[in-house]
Structure formats: C-alpha cells, structure tokens
Amino acid sequence: MRLNTVVLADDAAENIGELCVMLKDSTQQLLEQLDRTRNDIQINNAIYCHDAVNKQNLSEKVAVVNSNNFLCCWYGHGTDTSFCMNGEDVVTTVENHYVFSNALVYTFSCQNGGTLADVLIDNNAKAFVGYSGNANCPYGIDDVTCGIAMSFLSSFFDGKVLDDAVDDLKSSYEDAVFNKDLEPFQRLWFQENRDNVVLKGDASLTINDLLVA
C-alpha cells in the first residue's frame, strides 16, 4: 500500500520562513519513520517550497495524486479565504480549492480553518485540521512550536483516529500553556493556538484510510 503526501512549505514567508522549513523537515522525518516502522506502506512524498509552486501550476502538481486519498500539509501564511506561498494566494475559495478533493489537509497557517476549510470540505476533501484564527509562533522558540505542530502527525501516523490526534495536538498546546519555562506571552500565544484548532470533515479518519493500492 502507498501513502501519497504533498507538502507545501513557504520557506520565503515573512517572519516564519525558517519555521516553515523546520515543519517541512520534521514532516519528512516523521514520514521516514513511518516508512521504517510500517513495512506495508510505501511513502510517496512530494515537497514544494516557494520557488516550485504557484497559483498557475499548483493544480498540475497535486493532480498527480488527487484521484485517490492523500495527505497534504500546508505551512505558511493564510487568511480566512486563502493560503499563501511567496506572497501569492495559491489556494483560495475560488481557485485551486478543488484539487484537494480526497485529501486530509493539515495546516500550520492562520485562519484557514474558517471559510476556506468549509469550501474544501464542500469540494470533497476528506478532512481539514488547522486554525480558525491565528496560528501563533512566538519568536525564538520555533523548535517548541514545531514540536507541538508535529504532535498531531505523530499521533495520526501511530494509528489514532483523527479526532484523537487532534486532542493530542490540543494537549501539546496545553502542556506549553502551563510550562513555566516559557515566557508569559509565549504561553498566552500557545493558549490562543489551542483554542483556534479546528477539525472539519471525517473525524473518524485513520492513516489506513489514506492508503492506496
């Protein structure tokens, strides 16, 4: 069985480019770990940074896998109606949303869990996990932010249903909120992240549901 994945990481994103690279690399590491522990899974992972994807070619890139179920991760800036790469809205409520039919979309991006997520689900995305408001990344602790964000993928790859994996993500934020080694403002930002986490679509989805022959 094969797991098809697409990672969109805006390494040129203002203020968060380095975090997006860290998220991309950590996602790749988790996929490699999954490949080692699950002998029945072949990983087919495509990674696109700011210089490889734009509004015009995104559908062509994703069309390679979107006839079947797949995982797609977005790391960059967002709004209620768009996801941005290199200053360009590459996914919006009127453009390119349709290419994510059959996808579990996982994002670390602001506000994509609002109207854009609804449009994705209406266009047959399997599920969406992201943020209805800000996805904060406190300055100077990108490693902490990345670790929290990856807790969702780690749990999902371990076989947990989507709903439980999202609970683990919220628990990771909760741990940060009560971590006295962090500055008060950092803890408040992570609290906002926790409160903004949203799951839309099929909450019973598991990693096995994304596998294709």
PLM features: residue spans?
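Active-site-proximal C-terminal subdomain of hydrolase catalytic domains
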Residues: 113-213
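Solvent-exposed loop/turn segments at secondary-structure junctions
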Residues: 12-15, 55, 77-81, 110-115, ...
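Short amphipathic alpha-helical segments and helix-helix/interface helices
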Residues: 27-31, 59-63, 90-97, 117-121
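ADP-ribose/adenylate-binding Rossmann-like module
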Residues: 103-109
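A domain-level signal for caspase-like cysteine endopeptidase catalytic cores
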Residues: 1-71, 75, 107
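Local beta-strand N-terminus motif with an aromatic residue
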Residues: 68-69, 102, 125
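A short, glycine/acidic-enriched catalytic loop
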Residues: 78-101
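Short, flexible/disordered intra-domain loops and linkers
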Residues: 15-21, 83-86, 139-144
